[in-house]
């Protein structure tokens, strides 16, 4: 199986438990990251000079964080799309970094799809996981990762299922309610509608990660420039609490539905 993500930390936030579970169960798990996350904000004050606005060394630092997360999750192998540094974090929509010559969103789709197809040819995944058409929350790099992954899947005869990673509206609502009752939570707990979610009626697949939740937390901690972990939750640099359910959620976008309710490989 193969996961296509935009930046270091996305793999742990959205699919960390699933990566850990299938890795532990013996699947060959490949994670492809499209950029180094150079435009990310930085939580530790002592590392702020790594930022794109200063030393511009954050991307290299995040390679190390990603490697540490990979050790925790146990994936088989990792690739950067086109090699480390080929594509740069574009930043959020409408910012100056969108125009960087190596910005992921400025790159030729044809080149990016060919680069991903080259990985497909090597590892021959049966299952591919990426974001939904909105990239989960609208980040330009997430949207481009979706487009590249879906285009590559359409041209690959070996991929039998394509899934989008999503957040369950019901699970998020329950998780936030629990965080509001927990006085240990050091972050601002948002209103339900503040976090992007998917209606549960649209969710096709629910993967139980309860046995791997602590592994997911270990991977989240590895991304220390981007993430602070709290009790049953984490926060990005905005300090907004996000719950970590015991299930990860997916929408089957392509391939047979039979057997896919709780297992990305079910019925294959």
Swiss-Prot record:
GO MF entries: N-acetylglucosaminylinositol deacetylase activity; zinc ion binding
InterPro entries attached to this UniProt entry: GlcNAc_PI_deacetylase-related, LmbE-like_dom_sf, Mycothiol_biosynthesis_MshB
Catalysed reactions listed for this entry: 1D-myo-inositol 2-acetamido-2-deoxy-alpha-D-glucopyranoside + H2O = 1D-myo-inositol 2-amino-2-deoxy-alpha-D-glucopyranoside + acetate
Cell cycle recorded as keyword: no
A Pfam family reported for this protein in Swiss-Prot or TrEMBL: PIG-L
E.C. numbers: 3.5.1.103
Keywords noted in UniProt: Hydrolase, Metal-binding, Zinc
Cofactor(s) named in the record: Zn(2+)
Gene3D superfamilies: LmbE-like
Top-level taxon: Bacteria
Positions annotated to bind Zn(2+): 7, 10, 142
SUPFAM superfamilies referenced in this protein's UniProt entry, alphabetically: LmbE-like (SSF102588)
GO biological process: mycothiol biosynthetic process
Cofactor binding note from Swiss-Prot or TrEMBL: Binds 1 zinc ion per subunit.
PANTHER family named among the record's database cross-references: 1D-MYO-INOSITOL 2-ACETAMIDO-2-DEOXY-ALPHA-D-GLUCOPYRANOSIDE DEACETYLASE, N-ACETYLGLUCOSAMINYL-PHOSPHATIDYLINOSITOL DE-N-ACETYLASE-RELATED
Family: Belongs to the MshB deacetylase family.
Chain's role: Catalyzes the deacetylation of 1D-myo-inositol 2-acetamido-2-deoxy-alpha-D-glucopyranoside (GlcNAc-Ins) in the mycothiol biosynthesis pathway.
Name of the protein in its database record: 1D-myo-inositol 2-acetamido-2-deoxy-alpha-D-glucopyranoside deacetylase
Species name: Saccharomonospora viridis (strain ATCC 15386 / DSM 43017 / JCM 3036 / CCUG 5913 / NBRC 12207 / NCIMB 9602 / P101)
């Amino acid at each position: 199986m193969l996961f296509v993500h935009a930046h270091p930390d996305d793999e742990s936030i959205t699919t960390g438990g699933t990566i850990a579970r299938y890795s532990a169960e013996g699947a060959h798990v490949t994670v492809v990251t499209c950029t180094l996350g150079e435009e990310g904000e930085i939580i530790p004050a002592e590392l702020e000079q790594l930022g794109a606005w200063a030393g511009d060394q954050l991307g290299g630092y995040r390679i190390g964080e990603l490697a540490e997360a990979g050790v925790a999750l146990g994936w088989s192998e990792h690739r950067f799309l086109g090699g480390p540094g080929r594509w740069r974090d574009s930043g959020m929509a409408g910012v100056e970094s969108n125009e960087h010559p190596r910005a992921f969103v400025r790159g030729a789709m044809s080149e990016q799809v060919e680069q991903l197809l080259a990985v497909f040819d090597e590892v021959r995944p049966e299952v591919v996981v990426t974001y939904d058409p909105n990239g989960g929350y609208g980040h330009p790099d997430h949207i481009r990762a979706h487009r590249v992954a879906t285009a590559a899947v359409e041209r690959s005869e070996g991929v039998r299922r394509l899934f989008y990673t999503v957040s369950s509206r019901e699970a998020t609502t329950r998780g936030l309610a629990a965080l509001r009752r927990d006085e240990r939570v050091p972050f601002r707990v948002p209103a339900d509608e503040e976090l992007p979610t998917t209606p549960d009626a649209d969710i096709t697949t629910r993967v139980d990660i309860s046995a791997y939740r602590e592994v997911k937390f270990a991977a989240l901690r590895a991304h220390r420039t981007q993430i602070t972990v709290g009790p049953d939750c984490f926060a990005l640099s905005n300090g907004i609490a996000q719950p970590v359910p015991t299930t990860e959620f997916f929408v089957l976008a392509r391939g047979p539905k039979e057997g896919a309710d709780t297992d990305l490989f079910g019925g294959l």
